[in-house]
Amino acid sequence: MSNNLFTVPEDWQKRAWCDDARYQKMYDESVNDPDAFWSREAQRIDWFEPFSKVKNSSFNGDVDIKWFLDGKLNVAYNCLDRHLEKRGDQTAIIFEGNEPGVEEKITYRQLYERVCRFSNVLKSCGVKKGDRVSIYLPMIPQLAVAMLACARIGAIHSIVFAGFSPDALANRITDAECTILITADEGLRGPKAIGLKEAADEAMDKAGMVKKCIVVKHTGADVPMKAGRDLWWHELTAKESTECPPESMDSEDPLFILYTSGSTGTPKGVLHTTGGYIVYTSLTHQYVFDYHDGDIYWCTADIGWVTGHSYIIYGPLANGAVTIMFEGIPNYPDFSRFWQICDKHQVNIFYTAPTVVRALMQQGDEPVKATSRTSVRLLGTVGEPINPEAWLWYHRVVGEERCPIVDTWWQTETGGIMITPLPGATALKPGSATRPFFGIQPALIDKEGNQLEGPGEGYLVMLDSWPALARTVYGDHRRFKSTYFIQCPGTYFSGDGARRDEDGYYWITGRIDDVINVSGHRLGTAEIESSLVAHPAVSEAAVVGFPHDIKGQAIYAYVTLSSGYEPSEELRKELSLFVRKDIGPIATPEVLQFTDSLPKTRSGKIMRRILRKVACNELDNLGDTSTLADPAVVEALIKNRIDACR
């Protein structure tokens, strides 16, 4: 835990939407009188018909969650149509291509017209309200158009990250019963071209239910087009009208399905609905990022993940924001790319993942200092806890000690940000997600099921629902209940552990399955990893537990070294001693393996399941590795594995 406290600068207290006193007042109302609070905040969007009741939800029994009952609205209308009168000529999306120099600025009116055209295309393909549409596109404007078009006509989009394998795509098409697939000839990722149509063809062969495949001509690569099934996006849209009336949707009608990894390795299709989701993403985007008219906002996530859904498209566009879509990667053509984009587009708000921060930190300060970044006033992180060392580098080097950092905790299932600083209200502690957002009631539960009061550590749960909470797992409500509502009855079980300090701040300690029990002592992997990364020789670390005859479990650490350091037995001993001194003897790694890389998904998350299997020598059952960014990393880990199981 970091002892540093960064107080809110006076200018932020004055300019922000929310200072500490207002946060306390709004938060208290949101939990003590949620009907009044959410009834007021729901007016930030336009309703075709008003809702009759704010909420009717229960975490017990069959688990039934409903918000803004009987209200009628359309998400695409709220992201586009209602802005046309005042913002029609304002930029909605800045597209920054993979190659420097490739860019496009799309106004709200242009985006509206493109969405209407493609809505009509979908209708001409027989898509109706409630139908599922699979989208397998790179980070190009057509991805935003496709998802908004689905929302406009009441279809349910299922976006599959464009780095996923044909098998992963086929599984998601089959599970959601999609008869329409939208893809591109190729995607671009740094110097590589990714054959999306090729992968889509293989997936369609496996899934066997896709009737129409709409293909964006992105790179111009020569790809096979199956007569009667495959259709070119540009040819279809050219024929259609720029007007398409929005479908009136019930507040609880589905908006999208997004697949997330399950503990069993089987993906879960998390279902989000319409009214509560758009109210909550709009509210969180405004307050967490302190978004004001005219700000240039950039979330670096891929829309294939929930962060991209909520904080590249839906939240920002509902607020009439300028949002950036970036096709490329942080290190192409060099490690200054992110900061060059910040300068080029005068970005004010920058939101990225801790794994990106650590990767850029590994390259030193020069790629950052080669740019000015004077426009940037707020930084954010999302996806996993950020270790204090990376937080401090981000604050000192990228933000030049003038930019607050909003370290946000939330999940695919929560729909929007849950625990977070508000930049004008919250003193910051590096590594802490700090305090709950409006309407969020976190609690800590011990292993006996008792709710902890005051400072403590336990399972992180939520005591009541919020508007953006997922409603079910598509086609499997029993799995929804068993995953999130059985472990601690009457609460939403996040699957994460957390610590609450004496100031009421929350520190996410990692997934529950990332807790190691060494000789009866429960240790969060995040704490040990942060300790290792605090050593100058360590660029990145991942820690897992493995069976031990005496201790029950012992610690196996995988360490990636910073440039200028070489693996050695001396360094291995030094790092083990470093952790021992920092946390205590109980946290000393039993095994420490040096590695050039860690196994990560294409969204940058470490696949700890793989690391546990390697540590325990369970090499014949590694499970699904289709989401790995670089499968060769696993081979290297196995080759250099240190015999650990006792």
Swiss-Prot record:
Gene3D superfamilies: 3.30.300.30, N-terminal domain of ligase-like (3.40.50.12780). It catalyses: acetate + ATP + CoA = acetyl-CoA + AMP + diphosphate. Keywords: Acetylation, ATP-binding, Ligase, Magnesium, Metal-binding, Nucleotide-binding. One of its GO terms (cellular component) is cytosol. Pfam families: ACAS_N, AMP-binding, AMP-binding_C. It is an enzyme of class 6 (ligase). GO terms for biological process: acetyl-CoA biosynthetic process from acetate. Its cofactor is Mg(2+). Acetylated. Deacetylation by the SIR2-homolog deacetylase activates the enzyme. ATP binds at G383, E384, P385, D407, T408, W409, W410, Q411, T412, D496, R511, R522. CoA binds at R189, G190, P191, K192, T307, N331, S519, R580. InterPro entries: Ac_CoA_lig, ACAS_N, AMP-bd_C, AMP-bd_C_sf, AMP-binding_CS, AMP-dep_synth/lig_dom, ANL_N_sf. Its EC number is 6.2.1.1. The modification N6-acetyllysine is found at K605. One of its GO terms (molecular function) is acetate-CoA ligase activity. Mg(2+) binds at V533, H535, V538. PANTHER family: ACETYL-COENZYME A SYNTHETASE, ACETYL-COENZYME A SYNTHETASE 1. Catalyzes the conversion of acetate into acetyl-CoA (AcCoA), an essential intermediate at the junction of anabolic and catabolic pathways. AcsA undergoes a two-step reaction. In the first half reaction, AcsA combines acetate with ATP to form acetyl-adenylate (AcAMP) intermediate. In the second half reaction, it can then transfer the acetyl group from AcAMP to the sulfhydryl group of CoA, forming the product AcCoA. HAMAP family: Ac_CoA_synth. Belongs to the ATP-dependent AMP-binding enzyme family. This is Acetyl-coenzyme A synthetase. It comes from Desulfatibacillum aliphaticivorans.
